[in-house]
Amino acid sequence: GGTELALMCDYIIAADTKNTRIGLPEIQLGIFPGYGGLYNTIKRMGDFNALNFILSGKPMPAKIALKQGLVDQVVMPSGLLQAAVNFQEFVKRPKGRILGSKSRSFLAVALRKEVEKKADPRFYPAPYALIDHWKTFGADENVEKDSIAVQSLFDSPEARGLMRCFHLQDGLKK
């Protein structure tokens, strides 16, 4: 989606409007962000914030995305072009904290416990698959590993059902 595409950029500028929302809703569709989405989110936000953001599946306003490190700058829509032209002058953003394998193992247990309160793995395997994938690979930039993990979820009956629900709800909004 759009957020994953933006995450591939070195610098992200978001418009400061009440309707600007930045999100990775894939978990609600029974999959998780692949194709570098997981890696790039961790790289920007750090492991803990990135996983909480991805596991929620909920979009965040631009100003919160700025505080979390997901975007680099938030400007009024009328200033987007000028901000893009001047982006080289902007201070380099700090990298998110990336955890080692021992820390990931510890945090994975805590994340699974939190997810278990909200989602039964029989019906919502994606959050558990995301945690397991992250625990194993961390912020390793390997699109092939991400693609394989996401594809196995994409082909599942749970994901097909969640995607159908999404499309039905989306159709009701129109």
Regions found by a protein language model. Give the residues of each.
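Conserved mixed alpha/beta core segments that line enzyme active sites in large multi-domain catalysts
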Residues: S156
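Amphipathic alpha-helical segments at domain termini/boundaries
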Residues: E4-L7, A50-S152, R160-K174
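CoA-thioester-processing core
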Residues: G1-I54, Q68
